Amino acid sequence: MFNLSPQYDKLLDHYSYMAKNGYHRNDGNFVEKVYSDAEPLKFSDNIKKIVEFFKSKSALDYGSGGSNLNTIKLSDEEKFIDYVGLKKIYPFEPARNKGKKKKCDIVLCFDVLEHIFINDIPWVLKDLFSNAKQCVIINVACYKAAALLPNGENAHVTVRPPIWWLGQMECISTLYPEIYWALFTSQGHQNTNFLGVHRMQDKLDSNKFVQ
């Protein structure tokens, strides 16, 4: 249904290089330790509520970078996995050849999609849904990154407004109407909006045309 473009692998090569060698920023500085922050930690409370609602046990951390959500701790020294109530989190990071995709109750995808070439967004979204048994939880950055690709371009290659991402999610969710999805969009490091939890089946079951 969806085909990946040649740019997908080219970008993956760039991110693999950056993970190994670091990257330049747009302010002229150079960063050696890269993509090791556990982005879902900032959303611990939201994830905890969703896990409790679905009684979820497992999660796939899609685009996990260099972090491991099974061991990383919150500021109070409690493990993230214990706080949110999950039993096992499977990391998957193709830029580091880390982990394998595994169908889980929940799929987490935080600060990943903005790094994907625009043609390949539908393919990746479909991949997220196909690996979820209950819910897909996404945060996407809607602003330019400080990081630069090795070719000098901005590392956030697909920057679009929140409503655009909402439309993408709604379209792909028609293929998986029983899967819930939650969307967060960030327009800055401290400026995050929650666009709610949705499920296409609820719209199909409604007696209203206007949704």
PLM regions with names:
Residues 115-116, 120:
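A short His-aromatic
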Residues 107-108, 112:
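Hydrophobic beta-strand segment of the Class I
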Residues 134-137:
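Short glycine-centered segments of the SAM/dcSAM-binding site in methyltransferase folds
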Residues 1-106, 122-125, 131, 142, ...:
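Conserved N-terminal segment of class I S-adenosyl-L-methionine
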Residues 60, 113-114:
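Residue-level micro-sites within transmembrane alpha helices that shape
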